[in-house]
């Protein structure tokens, strides 16, 4: 939620300080991503008949763990970079947010959807090709390999050095999804 005309690129909007408080579990929330915690009148108070889940979801002082990772700038603009459960750790200790890489890859030619996973301490892109675009272009398997090689090279010029993707695997079927449409990441680890 924000004010009309005051949006910042890659933000989810400005934090409006009514009925809810937000903070990030980070020593430097303006520069280092942390988990978004929320508290207030509009935040639910717990899981129905599930004390254990409620205790795990809240801090001792009542802040709800959203599972979202992000930052907030000095103007109270929120930037979400991923989910706690999907964050990967590089071999040199850098936090890697696969969703950021996937957004770039998903906008490349002939990519319908992608998923970044870690295998043997290297990042691997699982790619579902856009079958309709391939058919329209009359592209065969050999050309698909050339296209995806070019996509990988272009991707690795964009991402930070610690987020370089070492290889890709073509997936012939769309990824399994949750009812809300999120990829079931745990199935591809």
Task: Give the label of every model feature segment.
Residues 1, 66, 90-91, 178-180:
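Ser/Thr-glycine-rich phosphate-binding loops at phosphate-binding pockets of nucleotides
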Residues 1-78, 84-86, 102:
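Conserved AMP-binding/adenylate-forming
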Residues 7-8, 131-136, 176-178:
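Short, charged/polar, Gly/Pro-enriched secondary-structure boundary elements
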Residues 37-38, 48, 95, 169, ...:
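Short aromatic/basic micro-patch
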Residues 40, 45-46, 55, 69-161:
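AMP-binding/adenylate-forming catalytic core of the ANL superfamily
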Residues 113, 121, 152-189:
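Conserved C-terminal "lid"/linker of ANL adenylate-forming enzymes
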């Amino acid at each position: 939620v924000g004010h009309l005309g005051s949006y910042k690129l890659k933000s989810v909007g400005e934090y409006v300080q009514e009925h809810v408080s937000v903070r990030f579990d980070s020593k430097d929330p303006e520069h280092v991503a942390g988990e978004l915690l929320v508290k207030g009148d509009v935040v639910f108070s717990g899981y129905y008949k599930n004390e254990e889940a409620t205790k795990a979801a809240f801090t001792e002082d009542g802040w709800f763990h959203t599972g979202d990772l992000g930052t907030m700038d000095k103007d109270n603009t929120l930037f979400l970079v991923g989910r706690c459960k999907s964050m990967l750790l590089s071999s040199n200790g850098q936090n890697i947010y696969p969703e950021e890489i996937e957004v770039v890859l998903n906008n490349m030619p002939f990519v319908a959807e992608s998923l970044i996973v870690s295998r043997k301490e290297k990042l691997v892109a699982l790619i579902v090709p856009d079958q309709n675009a391939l058919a329209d272009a009359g592209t065969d398997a050999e050309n698909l390999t050339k296209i995806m090689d070019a996509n990988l090279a272009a991707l690795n010029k964009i991402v930070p050095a610690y987020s370089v993707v070492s290889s890709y695997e073509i997936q012939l079927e769309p990824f399994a999804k949750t009812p809300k449409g999120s990829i079931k990441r745990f199935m591809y680890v």
